[in-house]
Amino acid sequence: MTTMPYVNIFTKDIKKLSKFYIDVFDFEEDMSLRSPIFRGIRTSKSFFGFNAPEAYELLNLSDESDTKGIKFFLNFDVRSMKEVDRLVVLSVKRGAKIVKNPYRTYYNWYQAVLTDPEGNLFRINKRLPGKWKSSDWNK
């Protein structure tokens, strides 16, 4: 099976945005990855990278550097519904904005939808026990 060890995000401020995710989710920066245009933080099973705008040119993506709108979102799974609620409050204190307050989804998760300080979408989830019906998606 192919692995996906890194998920990277382009950011205007690698220091500020990586610190947001470190502070909220208690991740740790891997100092061996640090450069003037990159920060890498460890999650439980992968790394989360933050690329400065200069990385667009480095990757031959200069024409793509003026992105608008939401192009992806991150998911963070936690151990309890209380943890979802706690992390929502902490995220907002650190500069996030709530898009959708914690709620039960049709697929039987308890989740909240937020944007980080740069407007990137993320969800905080607790998968709940039990079955769900795909026919309930619009309820």
Task: Describe each model-derived feature in a short phrase.
Residues M1-P5, E28-M81, D85-T115, K126-K139:
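Vicinal oxygen chelate
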Residues N8, K15, D85:
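Conserved catalytic core of two-component sensor histidine kinases
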Residues I9-K12, R79:
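Residue-level signal for the nucleotide or nucleotide-sugar donor/cofactor binding architecture
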Residues T11-I14, T105-Y107:
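Conserved beta-strand-loop-alpha-helix junction that forms the acyl-donor binding cleft
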Residues L17-I22, S91, G119:
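Conserved active-site tyrosine of GNAT-family acetyltransferases
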